[in-house]
Amino acid sequence: SAPVETKASTVVPRWFWMRTYNKTMSSTVILLNEQNPQGIFVDPSVPLISVDDQGFTRGDGVFETMLSVNRRVRKLGMHLSRLESSARMLDLPDPEPEILRSAVERLMREATAGAETALGEEHIVKIIISRGPTQAVTSMQPGPYTLIMASPVPASIVKRRTEGVKAMLLPRGHEPMDNSAYPWLLAGAKTLSYAVNMAVLRYVQERGADDAIFITDERRVLEGATSSVLVAKIEDGKKVLYTPEPSHGILPGTTQGAVFEAARQAGWELGFGPLYPQDLFESDGVWLASSVRLIAPVTHLNGTALAHDPELTATLLNYLAQQS
């Protein structure tokens, strides 16, 4: 089909069905593709993808979710680095960090109002890279494209930073392995294929919990459904912060990495597993760490109350702020 002209005089394929960006929308979106390598604002109220888009039909793509506070995206460099790693695993074109960084900055200058919280004005910012439509259906061969979106952080997420979450231990269902052992399994890549993660959350929520922590058949702790696991142990003045060992099918967490770096500078010792359920039950604190939720204390595990020190949570949140 023939290309169409937007009001901004930018030629784009008709299959994107674009209109000019509407500032009254709660979400703000920038599209980057072959025709618009630097990105253009698009209207999020109209279809932006083809019906045969492989990101939509197969989950064939990668993404990053970030937190913006007062229009500044936290840990942007770390997220772009992980996005590049994920794209490489899927044989997608390497994202260009400077172009993406510039597009994110433009997005945040124009984004609609975020959520007002104790931290300031907060937005969720997502970068999605899709493989694009299948060549068998479309003759245009537009190739992979990128969407960058900003929207207000939901109040329910902010609430969990202080009130915490109830978690359940669930078996992963398969033994994790070194990330490089079977590259076609995409271990360690942040892909669009999140159906299992969402099914896990529905499963635990139907049983009165908020989140899940995966364990192996040997009961070794892995990670949350959409988060990293942090565990604190304080004894005789010695403070140690643990997380499960990396490179065993665990997605490297940018939030976990930021907290660890600040804790190290503050004199904490760091440990990288292995961790088992008993370590969590006997700890001085357990948290689920992710980019937008930040760190949420786990108040109950399998129905059993865990140690929960609000001051310790505040300390770790302060460490995270230092690394942003």
What kind of feature is each model-predicted range?
Residues 3, 117-119, 138, 157:
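Generic marker of residues within folded, mature protein domains
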Residues 3-5, 13-14:
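Short linear motifs in low-complexity or flexible loops
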